[in-house]
Curated annotation (Swiss-Prot):
UniProt-recorded name of the protein: ToMV resistance protein Tm-2(2)
A Pfam family assignment: WH_DRP
Gene Ontology MF annotations: ADP binding; ATP binding; ATP hydrolysis activity
Function: Inhibitor of viral mouvements which confers resistance to some tobamoviruses including tomato mosaic virus (ToMV) (e.g. strains L, B7 and ToMV1-2) and tobacco mosaic virus (TMV), but not to resistance-breaking isolates (e.g. LIIA and ToMV2(2)) ToMV and tomato brown rugose fruit virus (ToBRFV). Elicits a hypersensitive reaction in response to avirulent (Avr) movement proteins from resistance inducing tobamoviruses (e.g. ToMV and TMV) strains, thus leading to programmed cell death; this local extreme resistance requires rbcS.
Further comment found in the protein's record: The Tm-2, Tm-2(2) and Tm-2nv alleles present in the tomato mosaic virus (ToMV/TMV)-resistant tomato cv. Craigella isolates GCR236 (AC Q71BH0), cv. Craigella GCR267 (AC Q71BG9) and cv. Yukang 2 (AC Q5MLE9), respectively confers resistance to ToMV but not the tm-2 allele present in the ToMV-susceptible tomato cv. Craigella isolate GCR26 (AC Q71BH1).
Length: 861
């Protein structure tokens, strides 16, 4: 893992050298020379780390100490850089020349110590004949495979067809005992893939449905809340008495629920008190997956069990072939030599029939040349015992990653098992960690480079795609529990991060912690009460119900912390006092608060001049101070709510940004900023803004957005919430890059073809008054794929989606979503040529009883 620390040091030294050059010019040129020397030496050391690791794996025990020395050196250099940069910046701010000189002298002395250690390491390296492999292209841009996964069948069940047919018949059998099907087997066999395919196929035959990930550390209250939301329990009833109201609703509904990855029977004992038995006359069904047959037997009886087995050799090779070649490639092995085919079969044999091992191996091989030599090297690395195949393959696939991608992959282990992780979060945390840097001459943004890395991880089958965005990009993802365990094990071994369970013990080890994640309230509280020394902590993740994390933080400075993520339970609201010591976290770059958290960010946050991302979840009421605008590095300011909650967050006049304090060049996201605290003329300065959401849009803002030449030329996503009818006509036709538009208007709003961007892909209309004239405009949009109408008022009871006189009617529309319509009783389409690509019609919300024409019935949920 030394290579990860070395990469971090290299990236940080590039940043510091650039800052010194800009800020100090020739005054501290010799410091820049030291930084450049650090960068060169760390690159050199990194170039032979892989060779050293190979020698260690080959049995050369002497190399182990060398790798440990390299890791400690890289860690100390990272500490030095993280400590040095804020001091220089602070002294520059107040023009403390003597203090700055003192810092520089101190830094130079530390560099001399490091130089002596580098000489010793290089001497030992030569003694052990460790060579420079020069195989660490950390700057590679992963574009070739960027879109390979986009059109893949996410429910591929090669080799499981018989299992699928048997389970489908069992689920639809009226005499199914207990109404439960239990899919059991060892990790990696495809239990979840098979269960989700079944669930999605049969759920339309039930009145309501729910899919829940249970995982190793479940919380019954959160599982029940998740089920309640999916089956349509009202928010009021969830707040009043979740358990009783959920049970009452399920008793009268025919439901199907998938509980994925149940580890033990204790959680079922809690859930069954609320979930009614499935063997009633109603005919409800329960699908569970578990690696433990006894769990399935306990829940559904012996007859419920369906044990998955490893794939037979031919089915294994069929899956391997499907993943190696493009999905539309009919030639397959036609152009391959017989020897390459045999090597491929041997590789598949080492995977032991485990689908996860097979697809991960195929993902790794897709990144290599399709030659006998390249594949033989993989085969030789897999060992000779079939039973070791899966573990070997997973570790080998990790080592096959580009060095710059390895810490990005390990980051998935910071989240709990089965957690759905937003791509936005991952990308911006990687950037905050300096895992992703933009080199000189590269015109692409860091976010684009990070997205390439995420695409590559999905393409290699190391990460599972969960959701896509409106334009086919990754919205969220998950990691398989076996790969999650690999992340945790590798991270612990290398001190990359620790989970709370292994953080206790030797105070010396605790003091070395660089990243820590808490999944449990009790463990978190016990840990902080032990008064640990956390001077080196960079990343803190807390997934908890107890809001005391904020009070515990008051006792620590966290001077090197640059990523803070607090995810609170949704089941209750927490009023917190965020300590003023937040202002001491001078290295903080990424802040995310999620859950029902009420409080105020302290004014001391203005000292956090390196903040890049502030992300406040839509359920949180967190007030930002006015000084948040002063961060020169701010890229994303997100408040994910456009209702009263967001208004409350900004109920301070001092939030109004000073046009001269704003640093607009880096800003890419401003989401749900109240118009009254945002001066429209600032829009001209936001030249790199990609996403904008404004609450309470004024006429002056509409006018500014509607001028002939677009003021926001890079804008891709625009969300506007109007509190009253705008007198100005909105015109967005001059914005070619806007692909996603959200308009929230409580009254009638005049719209025509000039009101919309020409390349719109997703459109949401909320609280609109919809008539046939607006509908006629929408039908002509040439690229619109998804249309959502949220609590709209319809002036006519019947909505006809058929083509107009010109023949147009949603030529590219794939999804139409109508939520809680007011005044609409019928949706029809009378011709066969309209909406030729429509795949799904969603009717959701209360009182959504709409009659549909025959064609639309087939597409509705």
């Amino acid at each position: 893992m030394a290579e990860i620390l070395l990469t971090s040091v290299i990236n940080k030294s590039v940043e510091i050298a650039g800052n010194l050059l800009i800020q100090e010019g020739k005054r501290l040129y010799w410091l820049k020379e030291d930084i450049d020397w650090l960068q060169r030496e760390m690159r050199h050391i990194r170039s032979y780390v892989d060779n050293a690791k190979a020698k260690e794996a080959g049995g050369d025990s002497r190399v182990k100490n060398l790798l440990k020395d390299i890791q400690e050196l890289a860690g100390d250099v990272e500490d030095l850089l993280d400590d040095f940069l804020p001091k220089i910046q602070q002294s520059n701010k107040f023009n403390y020349c003597l203090k700055r000189s003192s810092f520089a002298d101190e830094f130079a002395m530390e560099i001399e110590k490091i130089k002596r250690r580098v000489v010793d390491i290089d001497r030992i390296r030569k003694t052990y004949n460790i060579i420079d492999t020069d195989n660490n292209n950390d700057d590679c841009v992963l574009l070739d495979r960027r879109r390979l996964f986009l059109h893949a069948d996410e429910t591929e069940i090669i080799g499981l067809d018989d299992d699928f047919n048997m389970l489908q018949a069992k689920l639809l059998n009226q005499d199914l005992h207990y109404g439960v099907v239990s899919i059991v087997g060892m990790p990696g066999l495809g239990k979840t893939t098979l269960a989700k395919k079944l669930y999605r196929l049969i759920r339309d035959q039930f009145e309501c449905s729910g899919l829940v990930y249970v995982s190793q550390q479940p919380r019954a209250s959160e599982i029940l809340l998740d089920i309640a939301k999916q089956i349509g329990l009202t928010e009021q009833k969830m707040k009043e008495n979740l358990e009783d109201n959920l049970r009452s609703l399920l008793k009268i509904k025919r439901y199907v629920i998938l509980l994925d990855d149940i580890w033990d029977v204790e959680i079922w004992d809690d859930l069954k008190l609320v979930l009614p038995e499935c063997d009633s006359k109603v005919g409800s069904r329960m699908i569970i997956t578990s690696r433990n047959s006894n769990v399935g037997r306990y829940i559904g009886g012996e007859s419920s069990l369906h044990a998955l087995q490893p794939l037979e050799s031919e089915k294994s090779f069929e899956l391997f072939t499907k993943k190696i070649f493009n999905f539309d490639d009919n030639n397959s092995w036609a152009n391959a030599s017989p020897d390459l085919v045999n090597i491929g079969r041997n590789i598949v044999g080492r995977c032991g029939g485990i689908p996860l091992a097979i697809v991960v191996t195929a993902g790794m091989l897709r990144a290599r040349e399709r030659t006998e030599h390249a594949w033989n090297r993989v085969l030789e690395s897999m060992g000779h015992k079939v039973q070791d195949g899966c573990a070997k393959v997973l570790a080998l696939s990790y080592n096959d990653l580009p060095i710059a991608s390895r810490p990005c992959f390990l980051y998935f282990g910071l989240y709990p098992e089965d957690h759905e992780i937003r791509a936005f979060d991952l990308i911006n945390m990687w950037i905050a960690e300096k895992f992703i840097v933009v080199n000189s001459g590269n015109r692409r943004e860091a976010e684009d480079l990070a997205e390439d890395v995420l695409n590559d991880l999905v393409s290699r089958n190391l990460i599972q795609l969960a959701k896509r965005t409106y334009n086919g990009r990754i919205s969220s993802c998950r990691i398989h529990d076996l790969l999650h365990s690999l992340c945790v094990d590798l991270a612990k071994e290398s001190n990359f991060f620790h989970t709370a369970h292994d953080a206790f013990g030797d105070p010396g080890n605790v003091a070395r912690l660089r990243r820590i994640t808490f999944y449990s309230d009790n463990v978190m509280i016990e840990f902080f009460r032990s008064n640990p020394k956390l001077e080196k902590l960079r990343v803190l993740f807390c997934f908890a119900k107890d809001p005391s994390i904020f009070s515990h933080m008051a006792y620590f400075d966290f001077k090197l912390l640059h990523t803070l993520v607090v995810v609170m339970s949704q089941s209750f609201q927490a009023y917190v006092t965020i300590p003023s010591k937040f202002g001491n976290m001078t290295c903080l770059r990424y802040l995310r608060l999620e859950g029902n958290i009420c409080g105020k960010l302290p004014n001391s946050i203005v000292k956090l001049t390196r903040l890049e991302t502030i992300d406040i979840d839509r359920r949180s009421l967190i007030q930002p101070p006015s000084g948040v605008w002063e961060s020169k590095h701010l890229r994303h300011l997100c408040y994910r709510d456009y209702g009263q909650a967001c208004n409350s967050c900004f109920s301070i006049s001092s939030f109004y940004p000073n046009i001269y304090s704003l640093h607009p060049n880096n800003l890419q996201t401003l989401m749900w900023i109240p118009d009254k605290f945002f001066e429209p003329r600032l829009l001209h300065r936001l030249i790199n803004l990609r996403k904008l959401g404004i609450l309470g849009v004024s006429n002056s803002t509409v006018k500014m957005l509607s001028i002939f030449s677009p003021v926001l030329k890079a804008l891709e996503v625009l969300k506007l919430s109007f509190s009253s009818d705008p007198s100005e006509q909105i015109k967005l036709s001059s914005y070619p890059h806007i692909a996603k538009l959200h308009l929230n208007v409580n009254r009638t709003m005049a719209l025509n073809s000039q009101s919309f961007p020409p390349n719109l892909i997703k459109l949401t209309l909320a609280y609109f008054s919809v008539d046939r004239y607006i509908l006629a405009v929408l039908k002509t949009f040439p690229k619109l794929r998804k249309l959502k109408m949220f609590i709209c008022k319809y002036n006519e009871e019947k909505m006809d989606l058929s083509g107009e006189a010109n023949g147009y009617s949603f030529p590219q529309l794939e999804v139409l979503h109508i939520h809680s319509p007011n005044g609409l009783s019928e949706v029809t389409c009378t011709d066969d040529v309209s909406m030729p690509k429509l795949k799904k019609l969603l009717l959701t919300g209360f009182h959504c009883r709409i009659s549909l024409s025959e064609r639309l019935k087939k597409l509705s949920k």
